[in-house]
Each structure stands twice: as structure tokens, then as C-alpha cells.
């Protein structure tokens, strides 16, 4: 395992001739218009007081070069599950589609980080996307005694911690890189 800061990471990537292609238009990764059950926002005005009190999750896209694609690039989707207290990324998955199964993989990775004797309240907060509202995703949460929480009316500010880590990953860690 190697740990490097943003600037060293950028320097290494520059030395290797790798650059990220940034797009000016946003890609929608959230479909909040569905008939799946949604859950109330349980973290509004709540400050996380310990690790594994609140987890936040979101999905972002990363553009990659693909010579077989008509325009020479395509997108992959990164799901991140992060502890809101420690800001530690506990689970992640890079996937070719937005299917819920990939978000579940990130959640399951995060669950594996919990202590065996963990029995405190754990809230999982996300947007209202179909991945997070799917029966399969909710089942993994409830089977592991995790309480679902979702943004109100699709407001990204209600999931600001997760949105911020996405911004950091794309615009600081991966800035200028090509995949």
C-alpha cells in the first residue's frame, strides 16, 4: 500500500504522461424520478460524533478513452461509501454501468470494515437514485442493521459530504489524467 498526497500524485502522473479528460457538461448519475420507496433525511442538522455513525454515498462518472467508442471516449461510474466523521473512504466500486449491483459492491466493502462487535446506530445517507432506493440495496442495509437516509427532493446540498469527495477525486486527484 502506497500513500501519496495530491501534488506528488499529479507529479507522478505527469511524468508518466497520463492526463484526465475533463468534460464541461455534467452527466446525470441520479434518477430520482422513480416509484421506489424513499427514506427521510435523518442527517439534516446532525453532526457525526464518532466513526461509523453516518456513512455517505454517491456516484460520479469518470471519462476514459475508448477507441471502440464512436467519439473515442466513454464513461465509467465510481461509487464511493465514506465515513462522514473520519472522511475515510470505506467502500468503492468502478463500474461500466449505473446498475445497483455495483453500488452494492461498494456498500459491502464498507460493511467489511465494521468491527465484528459493532452494534451502534449507523445511518447510511445517499441521494434518491434508483441504485440506493432499490430493494436489493435496502436489503443489504437492513440485513446489516444500517438505517437508510436520503436527500429531500433530490437536493445535492443534502448530500454535500459525498458530493465534496466526488469533486476532490475528479478535480484534484484525477485532474489532468487520461485513462
Model-derived features with residue positions:
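Charged DNA-binding/catalytic regions of mobile-element recombinases
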Residues: 1-179
Amino acid at each position: 500500500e502506497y500513500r501519496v498526497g495530491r501534488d506528488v500524485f499529479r507529479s507522478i502522473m505527469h511524468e508518466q504522461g497520463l492526463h484526465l479528460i475533463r468534460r464541461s457538461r455534467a452527466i446525470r448519475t441520479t434518477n430520482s424520478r422513480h416509484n421506489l420507496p424513499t427514506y427521510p433525511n435523518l442527517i439534516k442538522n446532525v453532526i457525526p460524533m464518532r466513526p461509523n455513525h453516518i456513512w455517505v454515498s454517491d456516484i460520479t462518472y469518470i471519462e476514459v478513452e475508448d477507441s471502440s467508442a464512436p467519439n473515442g471516449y466513454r464513461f465509467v461510474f465510481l461509487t464511493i461509501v465514506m465515513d462522514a466523521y473520519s472522511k475515510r473512504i470505506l467502500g468503492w466500486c468502478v463500474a461500466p454501468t449505473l446498475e445497483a449491483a455495483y453500488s452494492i459492491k461498494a456498500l459491502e466493502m464498507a460493511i467489511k470494515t465494521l468491527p465484528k462487535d459493532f452494534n451502534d446506530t449507523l445511518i447510511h445517507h445517499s441521494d434518491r437514485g434508483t441504485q440506493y432506493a432499490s430493494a436489493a440495496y435496502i436489503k443489504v442495509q437492513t440485513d446489516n442493521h444500517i438505517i437508510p437516509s436520503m436527500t429531500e427532493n433530490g437536493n445535492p446540498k443534502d448530500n454535500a459530504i459525498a458530493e465534496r469527495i466526488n469533486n476532490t477525486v475528479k478535480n484534484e486527484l484525477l485532474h489532468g489524467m487520461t485513462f
